[in-house]
Amino acid sequence: MLKTVLGLYGLLSCAAAQSNSVKVKWLEGIPDYLGGVTFGVPWPRGQHLANATTFTASGGVELQSWATAYWPDGSLKWTGHAIGATDSPADEYTITASGPGNTTFSRLRRQSSNSTRGVQVGNSEDKIVVNTGKVTATFRKSGNVLVSSIESGGKLVGNNGRLVLRSQSGTPDDDEDGKPTGINYFSFASKIHNTTVSDNNSQRALVTVQGIHAVDDETSHEEWLPFTVRFYLYANSEAIRIIHTIIYDGEAKSDFIAGLGIRFDVPLAGEEQYNRHVRIAGVDGGLLRESVQGITGLRRDPGAAVRSAQFNGTETPDKTTWDQRVTTRLQWVPTWSDYRLSQLSPDGFNIKKRTKAGQSWVKIPGSTRSGGLAYLGGSTVGGLALGLRDFWKKYPTGLDISNAATDTGSLTLWLYSPQAEPLDVRPYHDGLGQDTYAKQLDALEITYEDYEDGYNTPYGVGRTNELFLYAFSSTPSAGHLSTLTNNTNDPPVLIPEPTYIRDTKAIGSYWDVPGSPKDSEKAQTIESNMKFLIEFYEGQVEQRRWYGFWDHGDIIHTYDDDRHQWRYDIGGYSWDNSELSPDLFFWGHFLRTGDAKAYRLAHDQARHGGDVDSYHLGNFTGLGTRHGVQHWADSAKQARISTPVYRKTFFYISGGDERTGDLIRETQEAAKAFVLVDARRKVRAANVVYNPDPKALYLNFGTDWAGLAQAYLIEWERRGPNWEDARDKLVEAIKTYPKLKNGFVTGEAYYDSLTGAWSPPPTDPDNTGNITVSHLSGVFGVLETIDQLIDHFGPEARNTTQPFLDAFLDYAYYYGASKAEQAARYGKDFGNLNLKQGHSRFTAYVAHKRNNATLVPRVWSEYLGDGSKDGLAPNAPWKTVRISGSAALAPVDEATWVSTNAAALYGVAGIENLALVGAPDASSITGNSTAKLRV
């Protein structure tokens, strides 16, 4: 019956024609370049039916639209939209949804424009051809070449786009003398498994290529390192956006990545050597501007017009106009065939060039941080530019231009530079004799690391990079390439206004914009403190160089006051891996303010956490790893790290980023991983017998089930392949959890992963009332997930959801209640609990949901308390101290009173408390409904 209600509720209210307009604005002002953009828009429940709604954009802009999420009644919850390239982007766009209502709710068909200016796609048995109007790209469905040709202006300007991989079986530093023996070296090329293209393309086409790397020489090595490469092509655009993902599936002790990249050939036949151009991005928009055969600076001057043309990348005047002392001696002027930029640290890059293989390299003055883009081409034959977003932040990276003096040059972007040391993913210590659970738990008491042999594996972790490829029929101006470098590193982002997102309730009802619902001086202080924390972490990322192939996007857990250094080398105090939800703080701050700094922090965390901190192959698929010195080092593999609640905002606000969508759907696999990985194997009481069974998994509602529930919720929202099963499991979980005598205070219980049903735990088989309350259960997005879940079910399902919500509200109330209240309700108190400041939002949630003004003082007492060790006090310095001289390796700003745990919870609770109960001295709750507490 519930399914029927969920399907039909609200449809009658949609029977009349609907129209609604939403403004979307640029995150950081009007972009200098727009090669196409995809963005997301939320919609209130019941407002627009999926198969009866059309979308238009202001200014006559062509718009492609699709649904990314649905409310249970079939109305649109989130939509994705694409706009093609334009030379004059507007400062904002108004997206209008309109259409007659009806009483069916099939999927929204992707709307394609009838305009001939849109993307044209051809799909045959062996290839896919996409024409944007400026670029035509051909993608192969088999072999090792992903992109067989790229045309611009009717010219073939690029071909043979493929992936390259180098690896070796050992690392030279194992030998103190630096004379390694017994190391084997391997070279691999991409091997395509399948290539697909999106449907109904008008303003954007997406080509997805999946495959693996296979040896391309005489050596013997298993195929490995599976990849997914997505190519986004927009109408009227010269740019192709590329999302490149690999999954590490090697042996850490013998599979060392020595180079990982993407390579394109550039046809140069017929172009004079002096009309062939090399451009490599330097610092702050700067460029190395050279030609394969330079004619500036020679002893004899060819003429100002000739020199100017070469330097600016235009075709030089006819040679008959040159000084003949130059033209008759061009054979003595070297041609430089190879260029190489190596960014081996976040602070410096080197460049060099040579005439050909076998000749010495000549150094070119380098600098600090390259923009990560290179161009090879000619003034008449055209060429390609290829760039990597966050190039220097993801060091060691590189750019190679090869064979530029031949008929076919090549352009290689190294995601991991072969000039660097091999990528070493072996454990950072040998186990230190921790061969029993007792020893491992004892070691936890000193380094905070939860070690266990076999669990500290990188097998199954991934990495995603974002690249841009640009095609030209002639060499572009240096100014344009500089603009493209900026676009590569900071692509434009369109977002709806915060107040509109809030009003739709499409991503939670627990946040509000600053100053709402009521403002005050104390509220402004909290706002100022949260802004300080955002800027502090932005600064720490830079000062502490939290960059690198694996590391970019993460922050560190705890500070070492004595060393004036974050604890990068101490067990569980190192890389944070989303511990206690800094992601929710950064995304929450962005949602309510539109702040670009918060967006960048959150975006980078979403990319990093979803790929590096989580598993995509093997027994741990769907789970993530607890904080540690290496992102995969800790033996705690849990859904609390991989939970999609950390990536949900990015998925929807981006218009349904496909890689993030994969990660979210993958988290459903955690249900299978729970059978293979017992999260409490080391700490379970000896008298508890537990044998993991898909029908009886012993799970914690906060650290285990909440992540799985969020994955099921998004699958239901998206109407994915498994959505009905996901919905049914959520319904069953919501119906059965309140039947546990102590509700959420039970903490851990049996979960049937086949049906979603809960039953009493093995410690309380008769359901007399178990009490297991942990400070960790509530700090990995469980409140946010439950709120979104209840919102999604909606008022029509209240009979089903209310007992579940009441059980959760009881838990939320009693967590911060006095021990006497706890004992009076449950027979005994909960003991000494931590993270009271972070849990103040649970009290606020109860106060808000039950309209209980008497709880508001408790909210702010918990939040603005005495600054216990796990919180940030109002009287904290709220400023940094400069450390310089011999006290630190380099000058840094420190705040010894800040830990990432405390900062994350201060931010999340601050955002939610202000929204749920109003400012500390101006409460928005006027009721006094103590009776509603049911205590």
Region spans (language model):
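Fungal secretory targeting signals
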Residues: 1-17
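Glycine- and aromatic-rich loop/turn segments at beta-sheet edges
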Residues: 20, 64-66, 503, 535-571, ...
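Surface-exposed beta-strand/loop patches in extracellular or lumenal glycoproteins
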Residues: 25-51, 253-266
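Solvent-exposed beta-strand/loop surfaces of large extracellular or lumenal domains
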Residues: 56-79, 434-446
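Intrinsically disordered, low-complexity Pro/Gly/Ser/Thr-rich segments with frequent PxxP/GP/PP motifs
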Residues: 78-100, 451
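Beta-strand/loop-rich accessory regions of lumenal/periplasmic or secreted enzymes
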Residues: 123-476, 480-495, 553-558, 577, ...
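Substrate-binding groove/exosite segments of carbohydrate-active enzymes
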Residues: 364-390, 399-402, 407-411, 415-465, ...
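Terminal, non-catalytic domain-edge segments
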Residues: 479-489, 710, 714-935
